[in-house]
A protein has these predicted regions:
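Active-site and substrate-binding clefts of carbohydrate-active enzymes
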Residues: 2-46, 181-191, 210-211, 225-430
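Short, well-structured secondary-structure segments
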Residues: 3-8, 14-116, 140-143, 163-168, ...
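Short, solvent-exposed loop/turn segments at secondary-structure junctions
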Residues: 10-13, 74-78, 107-110, 147-150, ...
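Generic structural signal for well-ordered alpha-helices
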Residues: 52-56, 88-92, 121-128, 154, ...
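Acidic, His- and aromatic-enriched active-site or binding-groove loops in soluble protein domains
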Residues: 87-104, 137, 158-179, 183-195
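CE4/NodB-like, metal-dependent polysaccharide N-deacetylase domain
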Residues: 119-146, 225-240
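Alpha-amylase-like alpha-glycosidases and glucanotransferases acting on alpha-linked glucans and related
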Residues: 175-226
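Long, low-complexity, intrinsically disordered segments
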Residues: 440-484
Length: 484
């Protein structure tokens, strides 16, 4: 039986503001708050909210038959928490239907997987904890930034304990093979690989409303037939796309949501089921390893890193950013960590691309890739200065790590002592209350009987007063005072 693996990504980058050379050292805030609020609010209203409501309706209508998967970047979660919490509430409502699986990905939606394995592990752990706190589930399958995958990345992900990973069904890696099978990492067979079908995925996300497309207009019945016509021995078709394809890339007026809501019925008529990534990793056997020497992605015709690292400016910017990666990770300063996450986001490098077809010409506030490069490098100059001021270059990473570990251990000891003091205070307070309660509960003691009055004693006779002695007048002397 053939299964559909339907996956949506939610990512929003943090927009940077105009930052000039003379701002370095004086202004440590790098973000365009107005544009961040405007873009996330617009995307939520026109795409995320109506799309999630449609998916909830599908889950309630089709029950356990319908299933899908989601991943969210950390930057997207932070923006949604601040400006559009309704999206997270709808995701939680969808989660309660039992039809959705949440995947892990790097917190920043950056390139730590190819630049710093330790930073990559740290980011994935932080994002997994965030997903657990929001939805109460622990991700078991990983999706990398931009669907990036290579053998080395796969081995790293397997080492972290994930059972599966999503990847692009790129021609340069598949060759004659089909993306409709389950493969495994060439360096570690424990990691199963689910490969995106680029053609069928982009029929929905990119071509659905293209009036010049020879298949326009696309109906759910036609699309379900295309999937059913795939060879019967091919067990899975992976449809991966950004959630904003529903409402932004393909406007709501194109009836994209009506197409989506009609699709499960048509697929069921063709004997096709839905399955989550974890279910497929458990149910299907790998047909063999998939060697991927160089990283692949789901962007542009080349399906490689060229949209982000295709020119010398992008490479220099990424190298400069990761020159302080270990110090930021080891140091753990919250403000630096937050800036680090935002500056890593892949969109910052894509604005610097000189490829004609990259991003469709959209560059945000920048007039050219060189303008984007200058602005980004100015911000990096200030950011790196702050890192070096807090963690001087004279201290190497091992020494810094040892120093911060000592400080942390001392802080932990103080915290333990504070907790012990609080426990003793609580114990003393409880004992005092118990003693007071016992005193109040005890019956009042009866007063002691008075001793009988002693009989009155006969007063003793008064002693008679002795007669006063006769007064002897003082003899006065004569003329000489009695002197001889």
């Amino acid at each position: 039986m053939k299964s559909i693996c339907l996956y949506f990504e939610i990512h929003q980058n943090i927009h940077l503001k105009r930052y000039r050379f003379f701002d370095i050292g004086t202004d440590h805030y790098y973000y365009d708050d107005y544009e961040n609020e405007r873009s996330i609010t617009e995307t939520a209203e026109n795409s995320y909210i109506p799309a999630l409501r449609a998916l909830i309706e599908m889950a309630e209508r089709y029950g356990s038959y319908f299933k899908c998967a989601f991943s969210l970047s950390g930057t997207a979660i932070e923006l949604l928490e601040q400006y559009s919490p309704e999206v997270l509430e709808l995701l939680d409502q969808l989660n309660r239907t039992g039809c959705v699986e949440f995947l892990a990905e790097p917190y920043s939606h950056g390139f730590s997987s190819i630049k710093s394995p330790e930073c990559f592990k740290d980011e994935v752990r932080r994002l997994s904890r965030k997903i657990k706190s929001l939805f109460g589930v622990e991700p078991r399958v990983l999706r990398n930034s931009c669907l990036m995958y290579s053998d080395e990345i796969g081995a790293l992900v397997a080492e972290m304990g994930f059972k599966g990973m999503l990847a692009e069904g790129a021609k340069q890696t598949l060759g004659w093979k089909s993306p409709h099978y389950l493969y495994h990492c060439a360096l570690d067979p424990r990691l199963k690989l689910l490969l995106r079908d680029p053609g069928l995925s982009e029929d929905i996300s990119y071509r659905f409303n293209d009036r010049s497309w020879n298949e326009y207009p696309l109906y759910a019945e036609t699309y379900a037939r295309w999937i059913a016509e795939q060879p019967a021995e091919q067990p899975v078709v992976c449809l991966f796309m950004e959630l904003c394809a529903l409402g932004m890339f393909q406007p709501l007026e194109s009836n994209i949501l009506e197409f989506l809501k009609a699709l499960p019925e048509q697929l069921r008529d063709q004997g096709i089921t839905f399955a989550t990534p974890s279910e497929l990793c458990e149910q299907l056997e790998s047909v063999g390893p998939l060697p991927v020497e160089y990283p692949t992605t789901w962007v542009d015709e080349e399906r490689d890193l060229s949209p982000w690292l295709g020119n010398i400016m992008q490479q220099e910017a990424l190298d400069k950013l990761y020159s302080v990666a270990d110090r930021v990770r080891i140091g753990g300063d919250k403000r630096l960590r937050q800036d680090w996450d935002y500056l890593q986001a892949s969109n910052n490098l894509r604005f610097i691309s000189t490829k004609a077809n990259s991003y469709g010409g959209y560059r945000g506030i920048y007039s050219s890739p060189y303008d984007a490069f200058t602005n980004y490098m100015n911000i990096l100059g200030d950011f790196i200065t702050r890192v070096n001021e807090l963690y001087p270059l004279e201290i190497d990473n091992d020494e810094l790590n040892a120093l911060l570990t000592t400080i942390k251990n001392q802080g932990d000891e103080l915290e333990v002592k504070d907790k012990e003091i609080d426990k003793l205070k609580n114990l003393i307070g409880r004992l005092e209350k118990e003693a007071q309660a016992r005193e109040e509960a005890a019956p009042a003691e009866a007063p002691a009987p008075e001793a009988p009055a002693a009989p009155a004693e006969t007063p003793a006779p008064k002693a008679e007063k002795a007669p006063a002695a006769a007064h002897t007048p003082k003899k006065k002397g004569g003329k000489h005072g009695g002197k001889r």
